[in-house]
Amino acid sequence: MERIKELRNLMSQSRTREILTKTTVDHMAIIKKYTSGRQEKNPSLRMKWMMAMKYPITADKRITEMIPERNEQGQTLWSKMSDAGSDRVMVSPLAVTWWNRNGPMTSTVHYPKIYKTYFEKVERLKHGTFGPVHFRNQVKIRRRVDINPGHADLSAKEAQDVIMEVVFPNEVGARILTSESQLTITKEKKEELQDCKISPLMVAYMLERELVRKTRFLPVAGGTSSVYIEVLHLTQGTCWEQMYTPGGEVRNDDVDQSLIIAARNIVRRAAVSADPLASLLEMCHSTQIGGTRMVDILRQNPTEEQAVEICKAAMGLRISSSFSFGGFTFKRTSGSSVKREEEVLTGNLQTLKIRVHEGYEEFTMVGKRATAILRKATRRLIQLIVSGRDEQSIAEAIIVAMVFSQEDCMIKAVRGDLNFVNRANQRLNPMHQLLRHFQKDAKVLFQNWGIEHIDNVMGMIGVLPDMTPSTEMSMRGVRVSKMGVDEYSSAERVVVSIDRFLRVRDQRGNVLLSPEEVSETQGTEKLTITYSSSMMWEINGPESVLVNTYQWIIRNWETVKIQWSQNPTMLYNKMEFEPFQSLVPKAIRGQYSGFVRTLFQQMRDVLGTFDTTQIIKLLPFAAAPPKQSRMQFSSLTVNVRGSGMRILVRGNSPIFNYNKTTKRLTILGKDAGTLTEDPDEGTSGVESAVLRGFLILGKEDRRYGPALSINELSNLAKGEKANVLIGQGDVVLVMKRKRNSSILTDSQTATKRIRMAIN
């Protein structure tokens, strides 16, 4: 009450009223701004004001027993006043200094482990090199970038489970650690953090930095991998840039880079196989990148490169809703269109069937080295604003936009026939035909486009058909801008479908991606990519195909051998022999195949002529569709090391060399593995291998029922007898052995006994 009376008294004096009304503080909005809510409105001022006080910091009461009242200089370190509203004491900033110098020492062993990302950053900066500063206009475009080097790629939910398990292992709550990476990380971190005294909350924060990819939408000119983004403030300003080479690489950037290379290789390879989608899936599932399964990386990695997105679509994952054309990512920002088929005539009077987009639409186009805004109507380019690093990049963007516009003058600019094919030798679709044509040479396109006078607009300039800049004239509708076009910021993902030929469509049926969009750029992966699929054997050239094919036969010899005798056609059709065919001269493939198949048939017919080494050596040649001919060969040619080399049908050669004493096979001097059995003895009858574990009793005995196939033998109980069909229709009586110990001798005796039983 007293206070209120006092205030009323003050207000009655005209001077008080004048001060309060003439100064801006009486603005209710301002008073509200600085007094409402818990959020500090002017942190730096508050900090300066607090630090000017004698005791701006509060501490636990126990501190008074651990710190002297005064330091060596006699300055007071803590106040006897307790903090209003809590049972803490007020201390001076000098107390912190004293504590840091004289306080108790704790073990520092866990710091580098917990603050790993910071320690690594310091190392990278220490070893990084900063080059000269250049002053120039920076074309920055906002891109979604990774701001957190050195992280694993767990989803937020997966990381949360790992953190809870590591930091609060005894807390209640359902945590299911399923993925390989979750389990590995949890185990590793639990071991690292035994007896760790750092506060659990801090540990949790730091683990989050290590486990989850953090992205921001930032203006960037130049490198976008996380080791460049962490020094963005040092390397590029509004009008300057500083050259920088990072002092180390981080696994997350390496994973991104290697994933793109693996995905491109796989999509390119799948596109030329008989069933692209099935092949692509088979390869994704059997490939490892840096020791991690590629499918696991695809599930977690947000990279939006075309080949990566095709692989994700094949796995049924959601992908970005933007589409790709000519290496640019298009995102429709307004308008809409309907599609209908239309036939058009090129300048060479060739008829093309194109899907025309009818309606007004606006797009952003973002490429590696150029960006643009495109406004178009039905088969008409209204406006194109391009920005890019150099003339070449700008030209690329203009060509793509002109083709995409489907304008008649573009189609009429075609000279000559359009017959571009993809890797599988199939004709490209009309839009990609046009694109390839003008990417090769755009002179006629630019000349025929037409030019116009331009108004002087800030930051925009015209461009002539020969790509020179101009302030007076420009190609119709085309302008070059100093400012870049931002990448589409939304990270939304949509459900898509993918067809057999790897064309990815959204739910409206618009094609978002196709193998034609996958870059042909080759690179060297940072992490080891292990392709287990036979389709990828050829990636390292003919020699690798040769070695891998023979290694595969040797590794799977037990099954191959049985198929060779019982179901050769199925064996010849195995996809593992597909890559080998590219090494055999096309003209003679069929004859070789016919010759080898006949030879094999004779081996099956004539008991005892089974020769393991020869079967292994010649088997890949039998995979081609056979041509019947009377031709005999003593050697077969394969194209490796830039020329034809010969494999001898009988005997060793530099390509195929089997050492009988060591039982080792070398292909072109490279070790291809060991054969488990000696080709001369145990395998002279293929049945010997199959009849291991059975005793041959003699000729067929009808009392034991109809003859079983070799496959059906496995169902017999120990001691049970049965007739079995072997080789070429001969039937013998066998009994399943009661003991396993004597199995080894079966192979040797089987051959002799089969002969006796048959004769």
Swiss-Prot record:
Primary localization class, coarse: virion
Xref: Pfam families: Flu_PB2_1st (PF20947), Flu_PB2_2nd (PF20948), Flu_PB2_3rd (PF20949), Flu_PB2_4th (PF20950), Flu_PB2_5th (PF00604), Flu_PB2_6th (PF20951), Flu_PB2_7th (PF20952)
Disulfide bonds: none
Site label Mammalian adaptation, positions: K627
Subcellular location(s) of the protein: Virion; Host nucleus; Host mitochondrion
Motif Nuclear localization signal per UniProt: ranges: 736-739
GO process terms (BP): 7-methylguanosine mRNA capping; cap snatching; DNA-templated transcription; symbiont-mediated suppression of host cytoplasmic pattern recognition receptor signaling pathway via inhibition of MAVS activity; symbiont-mediated suppression of host gene expression; symbiont-mediated suppression of host mRNA transcription via inhibition of RNA polymerase II activity; viral RNA genome replication
GO molecular function, one term: RNA binding
Alphabetical list of InterPro entries matching this protein: Flu_PB2_2nd (IPR049110), Flu_PB2_6th (IPR049114), Flu_PB2_C (IPR049115), Flu_PB2_CAP-bd (IPR048298), Flu_PB2_middle (IPR049111), Flu_PB2_N (IPR049106), INV_PB2 (IPR001591), PB2_helical (IPR049113)
UniProtKB keywords: Cap snatching, Eukaryotic host gene expression shutoff by virus, Eukaryotic host transcription shutoff by virus, Host gene expression shutoff by virus, Host mitochondrion, Host nucleus, Host-virus interaction, Inhibition of host innate immune response by virus, Inhibition of host MAVS by virus, Inhibition of host RLR pathway by virus, Inhibition of host RNA polymerase II by virus, mRNA capping, mRNA processing, Viral immunoevasion, Viral transcription, Virion
Bilayer-spanning residue ranges: none
Entry GO terms, CC: host cell mitochondrion; host cell nucleus; virion component
Subunit composition and interactions: Influenza RNA polymerase is composed of three subunits: PB1, PB2 and PA. Interacts (via N-terminus) with PB1 (via C-terminus). Interacts with nucleoprotein NP (via N-terminus). Interacts (via N-terminus) with host MAVS (via N-terminus); this interaction inhibits host innate immune response.
Protein family per UniProt: Belongs to the influenza viruses PB2 family.
HAMAP family: INV_PB2
Physiological role: Plays an essential role in transcription initiation and cap-stealing mechanism, in which cellular capped pre-mRNAs are used to generate primers for viral transcription. Recognizes and binds the 7-methylguanosine-containing cap of the target pre-RNA which is subsequently cleaved after 10-13 nucleotides by the viral protein PA. Plays a role in the initiation of the viral genome replication and modulates the activity of the ribonucleoprotein (RNP) complex.
Official protein name in the record: Polymerase basic protein 2
Source organism of this protein record: Influenza A virus (strain A/Ann Arbor/6/1960 H2N2)
Organism lineage string: Viruses, Riboviria, Orthornavirae, Negarnaviricota, Polyploviricotina
